[in-house]
C-alpha cells in the first residue's frame, strides 16, 4: 500500500545518507577536485581508484556520484556538470574553402586511425566574435594522448596561422618532426598554406568538406575550450598566457580512455623519450 511504499522510500533514503557518511572523505576529495581542478565526476572516481587513494569500500562509482548530485547529497548541481547537459543537435555547415588545399585524408596512413603511435595531430581554429581582424585560438590535439595545444593567433588569416605554427615547431627544437608527424586540417581558408610544411617532412592532410567528424578529437577538445571562452566572447579579452593556462588545466584532467592518466603526464613522458634518444 501507499504507507508501505513511503516507508521503503524513507528507509532507502536513510541508507543513502549512511553510505555518504561512510565515504565522506572520498566525497570531499571529489568535490575538491571538481571545483578546484575542473575534473569530471568520472575523472574524480577513476583517478581515486587508479591511484588507490582510498580503500575500494570507501569509494562509490561514477553512476552513484551522479545519483548523489540528483538527490542533493553533494554540494553540486546538474548545471555544474557540462558533460551532463544536453548538447544541441543542430548541424551547422562550416564555411570552408571548397578548393582542394592539399592531400585528402583518404591518403593518410591507415595506421593513424588506430591511435597507437604518438605524433599525429588534428588542427582547427576557434572563433570568438565572428568579425574581421578578430584574434582566434589555434587548437591542436594529438590523437593518441589527447593532449591539446591552444595558441592565440592575431587573426584568422593563413599568414597568421603559418607564423604561429612556425613558432610552435621552433619551440620543440630539432625534434619537432618526431613530435608532429602528421597534421589533419579542414578546408578552411586559414589552412590554405600549411601544405608547404610537407617540405619539412610533416604529413599534411585535409578532411572532406563539411565532415568535421573526420577530425573529431580536436572538435571535442574545442568544446572543452568553450568552458573558458564562451561563444561570442572576444578572444581579445584573453592573453596568450591565459589561453595556454586553459590548455594546461584541460591537459591536467585524468581521462578514462587513458587509464585515468592525464594527457600532460603522458605527453611529458613521450617528450622525455624523444629527447633522450
Predicted ranges, named:
Residues 112, 231-277:
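C-terminal domain-tail junction helix/linker
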Residues 9-10, 54-114:
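Basic, flexible linker segments flanking DNA-binding modules
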Residues 30, 44, 65, 124, ...:
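Mobile genetic element proteins and their domesticated derivatives, centered on retroelements
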Residues 129, 133, 150-175:
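Active-site beta-loop-alpha junctions of metal-dependent nucleic acid enzymes
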Residues 1-36, 42, 47:
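Short, basic alpha-helical/linker "hinge" immediately adjacent to a nucleic-acid-recognition surface
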Residues 199-201:
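Short, structured coil segments at secondary-structure junctions
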Residues 113, 126-127, 132-149:
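Short conserved beta-strand segments at catalytic cores or DNA/RNA-binding microdomains
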Residues 185-187, 192-197, 206-229, 236-248:
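RNase H-like two-metal-ion nuclease catalytic core shared by retroviral integrases
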